[in-house]
């Protein structure tokens, strides 16, 4: 990805799975619970402690392409982040016989499989997203924003907030932000890929080609999740990027230099055409819901990213202060 690669030598797997690391034989696999770009995820049990865990298997291509840089970045970020609403990476384990290459620190010389060991969570938010009570919605949204605020104050963008990446445990009482595969550290003057965030939760600035962006991209995704909680269906279920923009503009209005200074300079702005109606009418579809909840959604889904509410300010909003 343009502007996304870590400099050579900046990340070494040996820093996280040193020689002598435990092997996956220390776990008993129970069942497969998922599959991603780089491998499978299993529910497992630590045969020593009896604790359940989630094993994310990272398949290496016989050393031909080395250890995926995206996974190395995810490991590094998760080792840095420590918050009750962020999934905890407990350790890295290896397949039996896995060995370092010459020198013992070159991640490109690893052989076999590497496993990321996470704390086990019962299920993801998708299972409750369309049938949660108002009090549950508030509880989940508060935890999501707390985890996200912690990421942002530590200069980390998640860049893939969606129901499948929000995990629930503790009898439905604990939410944790997970899957940091697209996450990355950020600076205000950085340039990043805009091919991130699942389409339904992707903000307009990325759809218009922006490469200089910050925390507001995650806030848009949170706003989409919040709206989906209330409506019990996705807010912007586009099938293509163009259709996604059209659905956003239908509810949030058409962007121009008046409501979003600088928008006309974005690479894909000239390719879009005004939709009808162009007036913002987002609040109209939430007229039967709690006014404080609607106010917060409205502030999360502002077209101009510089005007979107921050995670910190969202946590201070009237929605979280008022009793149900």
Curated annotation (Swiss-Prot):
EC number annotated for this UniProt entry: 2.7.11.22, 2.7.11.23
Residues modified to Phosphotyrosine: 38
PTM annotation (Phosphothreonine): residues: 37, 193
Gene3D superfamilies linked to this entry: Phosphorylase Kinase, domain 1 (3.30.200.20), Transferase(Phosphotransferase) domain 1 (1.10.510.10)
InterPro entries cross-referenced by the UniProt entry: CDK (IPR050108), Kinase-like_dom_sf (IPR011009), Prot_kinase_dom (IPR000719), Protein_kinase_ATP_BS (IPR017441), Ser/Thr_kinase_AS (IPR008271)
PROSITE patterns, per the entry: PROTEIN_KINASE_ATP, PROTEIN_KINASE_DOM, PROTEIN_KINASE_ST
Reactions accelerated catalytically: L-seryl-[protein] + ATP = O-phospho-L-seryl-[protein] + ADP + H(+); L-threonyl-[protein] + ATP = O-phospho-L-threonyl-[protein] + ADP + H(+); [DNA-directed RNA polymerase] + ATP = phospho-[DNA-directed RNA polymerase] + ADP + H(+)
Entry GO terms, CC: cyclin-dependent protein kinase holoenzyme complex; nucleus
The keyword Transport belongs to this UniProt entry's keyword annotation: no
Sequence similarity: Belongs to the protein kinase superfamily. CMGC Ser/Thr protein kinase family. CDC2/CDKX subfamily.
Name of the molecule in the record: Cyclin-dependent kinase C-3
Species annotation: Oryza sativa subsp. japonica (Rice)
Native organism taxonomy: Eukaryota, Viridiplantae, Streptophyta, Embryophyta, Tracheophyta
């Amino acid at each position: 990805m343009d502007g996304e690669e870590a400099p050579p030598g900046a990340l070494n797997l040996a820093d996280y799975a040193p020689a002598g690391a435990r092997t996956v034989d220390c776990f008993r696999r129970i069942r497969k619970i998922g599959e991603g770009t780089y491998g499978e995820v299993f529910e497992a049990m630590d045969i020593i402690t009896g604790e359940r865990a989630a094993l994310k298997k990272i398949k290496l291509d016989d050393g031909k392409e080395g250890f995926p840089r995206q996974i190395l970045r995810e490991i590094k970020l998760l080792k840095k982040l420590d918050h009750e609403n962020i999934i905890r990476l407990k350790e890295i384990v290896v397949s039996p016989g896995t060995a370092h290459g010459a020198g013992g620190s070159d991640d490109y010389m690893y052989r076999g499989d590497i496993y990321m060991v996470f704390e086990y969570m019962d299920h993801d938010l998708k299972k409750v997203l369309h049938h949660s009570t108002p009090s549950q919605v508030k509880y989940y949204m508060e935890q999501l924003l707390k985890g996200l605020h912690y990421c942002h104050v530590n200069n980390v963008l998640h860049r893939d907030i969606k129901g499948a990446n929000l995990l629930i445990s503790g009898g439905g009482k604990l939410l944790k932000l997970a899957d940091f595969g697209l996450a990355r550290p950020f600076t205000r003057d950085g340039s990043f890929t805009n091919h991130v965030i699942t389409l339904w939760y992707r903000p307009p600035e990325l759809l218009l080609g922006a490469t200089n962006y910050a925390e507001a991209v995650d806030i848009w995704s949170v706003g989409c999740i919040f709206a989906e909680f209330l409506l019990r269906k996705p807010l912007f279920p586009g099938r293509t990027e163009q259709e996604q923009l059209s659905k956003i503009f239908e509810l949030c209005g058409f962007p121009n230099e008046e409501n979003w200074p600088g928008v006309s300079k974005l690479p894909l702005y000239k390719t879009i055409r005004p939709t009808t109606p162009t007036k913002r009418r987002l609040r109209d579809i939430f007229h039967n819901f709690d006014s404080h909840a609607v106010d917060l959604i409205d502030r999360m889904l502002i077209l101009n990213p510089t005007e979107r509410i921050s995670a910190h300010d969202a946590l201070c909003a009237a929605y979280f202060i008022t009793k149900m």
